[in-house]
């Protein structure tokens, strides 16, 4: 069965399509950059016009005929499985194609049967179930488009949160920063075309930090909602609690943290059927893709020892079951934990909330696979104008090179591994060089946007 919006993923002959898509991406980036400068200087235009323009651009792009990501089709599977047929999407251990449902069969023709189990937060799954029930009789195209529209709405809400974070900045800096985020090509592409739920997660997280000083309890609920959509923001709970304790008191800080963890726990309760429910979540990011982690693992892969135990002779011990690949990932996880602790301590001592970019960046850099939409998590940093903003803007722009790998264009040429490695080095490393160059340029004037 043919999908209504074609997924260009690992496809043969994808090179021309990829080049055309990258050209569109570049044009969106150029137009967004110019529009940001125009809005910075347009003192007679209200800030709400940024949100309206972003929504219009997003809705227009939501009719794009192809996508590099199949995630919205997975969302549709979970929506129908849970909302219409009352299945638990966290434990798809058997075929579900026996259900006579045309929409499900179209999706399963792409994903296989059984499809991958749900790896998203329980709050998102509950919301998807409601959407699935409301769209029971709708076509697959409409259900796919709904996912794109929700992502656009999340991106617009995130821009509104950025404006709130920039409340103390000069009007021109506020408009410029919010516009740089709203019209960044990766933001527009991954929301309107990719249709990723990351934008709803990001909107809740941004608003949690935008409201933490005035409404700490609300901030805890919002961060809990973000975790309930996708589990990544759990890394930010200690930072938010430290901020509340510093600006309010210990009781409010503990309540904020409890709510942030309580929302995902409470919404996960209906899906809990034992430890087997956690299996898809624990293995969600286990596969290596293009990333610094993959590059560093190449020597292990070349020698064929990635899955070999580090101490095969120590029978019955933990080391006998610990592989070199897992050991390497555990070391990276400890590095992320160290960054979380250092940022939490810094915020507790009065550091700016913008230090959370360190946590987000460390987490992205240590992932087994850095998908293009993961870079979205760092995109709010573009609004704040310093070296982090420069780094984030270029990181997001160069993340489009990932589409050449996603589409299959790179896999179809000789030396595919070398090409993939080169793309990884460029889109992960070049933004650092650009940011450092901008920071050290003699006479460079950086308009700093203030956010506590």
Q: Residue ranges of each PLM-predicted region?
A:
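Start-transfer (signal-anchor) and selected internal transmembrane alpha helices
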Residues: 1-63, 348, 353-354, 435-441, ...
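Aromatic/glycine/proline-enriched transmembrane-helix motif characteristic
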Residues: 28-32, 151-155, 159, 168, ...
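Intramembrane catalytic core of multi-pass membrane enzymes that act on lipidic substrates
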Residues: 44-148, 152
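Transmembrane-helix signature of polytopic, membrane-embedded enzymes
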Residues: 44-52, 162-184, 203, 215
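Hydrophobic alpha-helical membrane-interfacial segments at the cytosolic entry of transmembrane helices
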Residues: 53-57, 248-272, 398
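Specific aromatic-rich, kink-prone transmembrane helix
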Residues: 157-161, 200-216, 341, 360
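Membrane-interface alpha helices of multi-pass inner-membrane proteins
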Residues: 178, 189-191, 207-208, 217-241, ...
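Aromatic-enriched
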Residues: 386-452
